Swiss-Prot record:
Lineage, broadest ranks: Bacteria, Bacillati, Actinomycetota, Actinomycetes, Micrococcales
SUPFAM superfamilies: Class II aaRS ABD-related, Class II aaRS and biotin synthetases, ThrRS/AlaRS common domain
Region entry Catalytic, spans: 260-566
Keyword tRNA-binding: yes
Family classification: Belongs to the class-II aminoacyl-tRNA synthetase family.
Assembly information from the UniProt record: Homodimer.
Protein name: Threonine--tRNA ligase
Residues that bind Zn(2+): 365, 416, 543
Chemical reaction(s) catalysed: tRNA(Thr) + L-threonine + ATP = L-threonyl-tRNA(Thr) + AMP + diphosphate + H(+)
Metal-binding in keyword set: yes
Cofactor, free-text remark: Binds 1 zinc ion per subunit.
Species, as recorded: Arthrobacter sp. (strain FB24)
Domain TGS: 3-60
PANTHER family in the cross-refs: THREONINE--TRNA LIGASE, CHLOROPLASTIC_MITOCHONDRIAL 2, THREONINE-TRNA LIGASE
Cystines in this chain: none
Length: 669
């Protein structure tokens, strides 16, 4: 074989010579777990020839990218099954998502649970046929001919040149570069039995999907995520490399459903979502109010200790404030409509005094800037750390509102820090350490950081300032010792940010705190301080939300603890259960001693039998149950019963009180 017939590749870091035209499938023939190739950083189907000098990496089915390909291919098989069972179904979009996939369909009747079972059977039949996924590059005319009976696909072809901004999931189907169609090809006849407009890549064949998949639910969804468009039916599913992995995922989902904060909120009488108030507007019941107050009180004290100044701002403002801040230019769709008020009319109906537009506050930062600007500021006052539990209102679409974690009315634990450029690095370091320490106090301790950097097409300020700020944030993040994940181009237009990602008890990731530099608002509000040399200078502005919102954080903690809050947060910390009515007075005396030292305690004097009272305390997830009978009363003692069912008998009352006080003070249990 001559050199002319060979090309050189870098395969998994090593130089390799192969025959011209070699495909990924041939290169990784002996590695059955490789399902696509990463070629110069881009994922490619295994049947594509590899170019000279390319850097090649085999992507396995159990890797993050491999799982995405598996799920995308399973979505295609599901769509094929739908059109076999419902030939009138029109195809929408079908991307992979976290842990699964979905596909949208325009159908006459919504899908039922029985339909999903029938679809799973049809999918297994397709999978066992070992159909090949074959990529085909086509012209736009050829694509339109192939998709002539698919109106939504024809619409997507018209969006090819602006796919990134065209709507939900469009760039999975079309985008820059070639137009491609993927055929599902019958292994025996070689004929295409189904096809879809898609950018890929896909598995080599359907057999690799095996039986480790499941269709999980169906729901309504608007075409391209726009509520003004046609309503379609969406089927969700999941797929994994093995049946064991699928089972483990299903067990995690079942546990997540048991921990769902909406379910626990009702069971534990913490909060509710009355229809009379509207979507995304929760109310907190007395027990939920206790938890929320304990969360806020602890945070408030920690902020005082860290040198923050508390401020309060109103819920509404004249619209001009958000013209100055730019929110009406950049964020109006996320705001509630204006209230036009204060107009005065003459008797004949003519306007004597024009009215003004007022808005519900979506952000606290413009008002905090007014506080900073309310008088002259000196460098000696900096850093100035303003903090507020500020109520804000955002017009979230009803389809994305979800329990406490996505609401329309929320309370942000919002801080804005003003400092000199020389103070910026130390202040960012202090802020990040403060954030991580406080989150740990609430029971979250598994973190990584994400650094969002400049979007080259959408930013204010100069490159040098952005570069310095980004470099400083990166240094601060790296010094924390936590994993740092880059988010290229993910920053808001006004500055780079660090976001703290926290994992809960189920291993799910939640974005918690953000630390955001802002080059925009100090300019817009003309914020200044007098520097040591007498000149007027702009302060560096740092936005910092620790919980995100109190509501969202409470939802996260409810699921993290499965409703079994640590004693310091629990609405009822102790329940006393006398073994018989004769010992009620004794138990009331014990509970009074606990109340005297600030413990939330009560006695169960219901008519229920003793075993039922124990079960009730367990169901209500009470941290400590104190039990007293004759021997306890004579000895001045109680029996401790813990959440795990273990029990410590004959504990002197004074010791019991001290144990509970220490557990609450130390935020344990």
């Amino acid at each position: 074989m001559s050199d002319a017939q060979q090309i050189t590749l870098i395969v998994d870091g090593e130089e390799t010579k192969v025959t011209t035209g070699t495909t990924g499938a041939e290169l990784f023939f002996e590695r059955r777990d490789v399902v696509v190739a990463r070629v110069n950083g881009e994922l490619k189907d295994l049947d594509q020839p590899l170019p000279e000098g390319a850097d090649i990496e085999g992507v396995t089915i159990d890797s993050p990218d491999g799982l995405n390909v598996l799920r995308h291919s399973t979505a295609h098989v599901m769509a094929q099954a739908v059109q076999q069972l419902r030939p009138d179904a029109k195809l929408g979009i079908g991307p992979y998502i976290t842990d699964g996939f979905y596909f949208d369909f325009d159908v006459a009747e919504p899908f039922t649970p029985e339909d999903l079972k029938a679809l799973e059977k049809m999918m297994l039949k397709i999978i066992n046929q070992n159909q090949k996924f074959v990529r085909r590059v086509v012209s736009e005319d050829e694509a339109r001919e192939a998709m002539k009976n698919e109106p939504y696909k024809l619409e997507l072809l018209g969006k090819k040149n602006n796919a990134a901004d065209a709507g939900e999931g469009v760039n999975v189907e079309v985008g820059a570069g070639d137009i491609t169609i993927y055929d599902n090809v019958d292994r025996k006849s070689g004929d295409s039995v189904w096809c879809d407009l898609c950018r890929g890549p896909h598995l080599p064949n359907t057999k690799l999907i095996s039986n480790a998949f499941a269709l999980t639910r169906s729901s309504a969804a608007y075409w391209l995520g726009n509520q003004n468009n046609q309503q379609l039916q969406r089927i969700y599913g999941t797929a994994w490399p093995t049946k064991d992995a699928l089972k483990a995922y299903q067990e995690r989902i079942a546990e997540a459903e048991r921990r769902d904060h909406r379910k626990l909120g009702a069971e534990l009488d913490l909060f509710s979502f009355p229809d009379e108030l509207g979507s995304g507007l929760p109310v907190f019941h007395p027990k939920g109010g206790i938890i929320r107050k304990a969360m806020e009180d602890y945070s408030r004290q920690r902020h005082v200790d860290a040198g923050y100044d508390f401020v309060y701002t109103p819920h509404i403002t004249k619209g001009h404030l958000y013209e100055v801040s730019g929110h009406l230019d950049w964020y109006k769709e996320g705001m509630f409509p204006a209230m036009h008020i204060d107009a005065e009319l003459n008797e004949d109906g003519t306007v004597r005094k024009p009215g003004q537009d007022y808005y519900l506050k979506p952000m606290n930062c413009p008002m905090h800037n007014l506080i900073f600007r309310s008088r002259g500021r000196s460098y000696r006052e900096l850093p100035l750390r303003l903090f507020e539990f500020g109520s804000v209102y955002r017009y979230e679409k009803s389809g994305v509102v979800h329990g406490l974690t996505r609401v329309r009315g929320m309370t942000q634990d919002d801080a804005h820090i003003y400092c000199t450029r020389e103070q910026m690095k130390d202040e960012l370091t202090t802020t990040l350490n403060f954030v991580l320490g406080l989150l740990k106090d609430y029971g979250l301790d598994d973190f990584y950081l994400e650094l969002s950097t400049k979007n080259e097409d959408k930013f204010v300020g100069d490159d040098a300032t952005w570069d310095e700020a980004t470099r400083t944030l990166a240094e601060v993040a790296e010094a924390s010792g936590l994993e740092l994940i880059p988010d290229p181009g993910g920053a808001a237009f006004y500055g780079p940010k660090i976001s703290v990602q926290a994992k809960d008890a189920l291993g799910r990731t939640w974005q918690m705190s953000t630390i955001q530099l802002d080059f925009n608002l100090p300019e817009r509000f003309e914020l200044e301080f007098q520097a040591a040399d007498g000149t007027r200078q702009r302060p560096v502005m740092i936005h910092r939300a620790l919980f995100g919102s109190v509501e969202r954080f409470m939802g996260v903690l409810t699921e993290h603890y499965a409703g079994a809050f640590p004693a310091w947060l629990a609405p009822v910390q102790v329940v006393g259960i006398p073994v018989a009515e004769a010992f009620n007075d004794y138990m009331f005396d014990v509970v009074d001693q606990l109340k005297a030292v600030g413990i939330r305690a009560e006695v169960d004097i219901s008519s229920d039998r003793f075993p039922k009272k124990i079960r009730t305390a367990s169901k209500d997830k009470i941290p400590f149950v104190l039990i007293a009978g004759g021997e306890d009363a004579e000895a001045g003692a109680v029996s401790f019963r813990f959440r795990d069912g273990s029990q410590d008998n004959g504990v002197p009352v004074a010791e019991a009180v001290q144990r509970i006080v220490e557990a609450v003070r130390n935020r344990t249990s």
